[in-house]
């Protein structure tokens, strides 16, 4: 008997993830600024890496701006490159 026979799935309903909107779009949205360390640190992982947009639900354009701001902030010494 093969394990893959029978369709798998177990008769469960398909899971549809709700599409999250970009936190930087719309009114009252925070402005991406390299000096705003508190905002930028929310988009940096515990290891110091920039969190991808598929996890944070940031749009592609704003993700590029965010990455540029994080890199600029690191260069100026406001954010660490590596968190130990």
Swiss-Prot record:
GO terms under cellular component: cytosolic small ribosomal subunit
A Pfam family it matches: Ribosomal_S18
Gene Ontology MF term list: small ribosomal subunit rRNA binding; structural constituent of ribosome
Cited Gene3D superfamilies: Ribosomal protein S18
Signal peptide boundaries: none
Entry keyword set: Ribonucleoprotein, Ribosomal protein, RNA-binding, rRNA-binding
Single Gene Ontology BP annotation: translation
Keyword Translocase set for record: no
Keyword ATP-binding found: no
Subunit details: Part of the 30S ribosomal subunit. Forms a tight heterodimer with protein bS6.
Protein family per UniProt: Belongs to the bacterial ribosomal protein bS18 family.
Biological function: Binds as a heterodimer with protein bS6 to the central domain of the 16S rRNA, where it helps stabilize the platform of the 30S subunit.
HAMAP family referenced in this protein's UniProt entry, alphabetically: Ribosomal_bS18
Listed name of the protein: Small ribosomal subunit protein bS18
